[in-house]
Amino acid sequence: MTAVAQKIIENLKMQDEVRSSDIDAPYSEIHGALISLESRGICNVKMEESYEEVLTPEGEEVERSGSQEYLLLESIGEDGMSIEELERHSLGKMNAFRNKWIRREGNRVFRNVESIEDTVRNMVISMKRGTASAEEVEALRKRKLVSRRKKIVFIATKGPMFFDNTSYVTELTSEMVLDGSYRDLSFKHYNFNAEGNAPQCGSIHPLMKIREDFRRIFIELGFSEMATNQYVESSFWNFDALFQPQNHPSRDAHDTFFLLNPELSTDFPSDYLKEVGETHRGGKYNSLGYMSNWDIKEAQKNILRTHTTSVSARNLYRLAKKEFKPAKLFSIDKVFRNETVDATHLAEFHQVEGLVVGKGLNLTHLMGILREFFNRLGMGDIRFKPAFNPYTEPSMEVFGYHKGMDRWIEVGNSGVFRPEMLRPMGFDSDVSVVAWGLSLERPAMIKYGLKNIRELVGHKVDIEFSRKSEICFFD
């Protein structure tokens, strides 16, 4: 039995309870002793949580030297202070000007008062003594001189085996077995409910946890998942099959990653390729098209897909070649954009896409599906805004109200696929397809409270973030 455990027992003999805060020993030793005593039934242990206000490093500096405004005033001589030197006292400068303790004349700053009482330092000292008022503590917290810290205290009381002085053996050795001494010993019982150390093994990335929850929502709604294992795509399936003009800005090298090797694709359905080209050039199916030249070499260029709608186009083409049957499909996978990397944008991200194939589907059906889908994501309050997409008409942007940010944010894009996209595939004129898409990273950042996307994806992600992040369910 350790010295700390013995001290706890001695204290319990004289009083009803012992608090860990009253024991002069390291936290780890106290905690270990309490666990050992509780496992043997000698004492019962409960945990009490509380919060206390403590000085931050900045607060401790104010306690030692004084507040920034006080130090600023003390450093201004009779000939004043230069503006350059004043800039080194950013916080003190603001408070001194606000209280009219200093004034500016030309390029120098002068005192308005000879001296001041350092009330901030006085509040810090009162806080440390425990005599500060709630208003004073709040004022110090706003200046980041005080922070709130969780305090955990363990309370031990006598257990059912407190008066049992039996010395328990924790390990059975070969010598005990050979000489038979184990028969006269009392062995400590195993606690099979005790938690062991977490193994240092691989962890599921938080983004993958979110992806699995998206998959669950789609599957619960009766959707089937499309295969998305083709990152390299031809411009034909990525752009042309979607009725996106060849002079569209998104097809420029500033927005798209083009492959050098292999540079071109040649494997296209010939009849479908011809239909798409004619629809672009002069229009078909009651459309004028783009009334411009359509170059097959432009369609052959290989790229890193810019959206998973290219996957949708391939699957819709296969569906059009079969006997008509309504379908609900979805995909979640990586896409690539040649964008400037910042706090909210990466050159690669995950796109979530869903589509419904049926007869007579219109904007009303799409809005109903979207309300149900986003409601399951925990975004019951959504709004729609008219938008433009080359391959959907009508098109809508979807906005959700984010309570934490207290504003409406764009959460997705949607629309009804144009006949110029569907008819060349072979669909009849009464077949409609409604679709929508959104990124996976944005809701993940919201759920995990992240402000910088590089904290979620990339080489700067903290490994502990992956190990300790809980699964965020959308409800």
Swiss-Prot record:
Cross-referenced InterPro entries: aa-tRNA-synth_II (IPR006195), aa-tRNA-synth_II/BPL/LPL (IPR045864), Phe-tRNA-synth_IIc_asu (IPR004529), Phenylalanyl-tRNA_Synthase (IPR002319), PheRS_DBD3 (IPR040725)
Keyword terms, alphabetized: Aminoacyl-tRNA synthetase, ATP-binding, Cytoplasm, Ligase, Magnesium, Metal-binding, Nucleotide-binding, Protein biosynthesis
Obligatory cofactor(s): Mg(2+)
Annotated Mg(2+) binding sites: E393
Localization terms from the record: Cytoplasm
The keyword Acyltransferase is assigned to this record: no
Gene3D superfamilies per the UniProt record, alphabetical: 1.10.10.2320, 1.10.10.2330, 3.30.1370.240, Bira Bifunctional Protein, Domain 2
PROSITE patterns reported in the protein's UniProt record: AA_TRNA_LIGASE_II (PS50862)
Region (Contains the major tRNA-Phe binding sites): 2-151
Gene Ontology MF term list: ATP binding; magnesium ion binding; phenylalanine-tRNA ligase activity; tRNA binding
Keyword Ligase attached: yes
Transmembrane segments: none
Assigned EC number: 6.1.1.20
Signal peptide positions on this chain: none
Binding residues annotated for L-phenylalanine, in chain numbering: T309, Q351, V352, E353, Y391, F417
Superkingdom of this protein's organism: Eukaryota
GO BP: any one term: phenylalanyl-tRNA aminoacylation
Catalytic reaction list: tRNA(Phe) + L-phenylalanine + ATP = L-phenylalanyl-tRNA(Phe) + AMP + diphosphate + H(+)
One Pfam family here: PheRS_DBD3
GO annotations of cellular component type: cytosol; phenylalanine-tRNA ligase complex
EC category: ligase
Assembly: Tetramer of two alpha and two beta subunits.
Assigned protein family: Belongs to the class-II aminoacyl-tRNA synthetase family. Phe-tRNA synthetase alpha subunit type 2 subfamily.
Protein name as annotated: Probable phenylalanine--tRNA ligase alpha subunit
Organism of origin: Encephalitozoon cuniculi (strain GB-M1) (Microsporidian parasite)
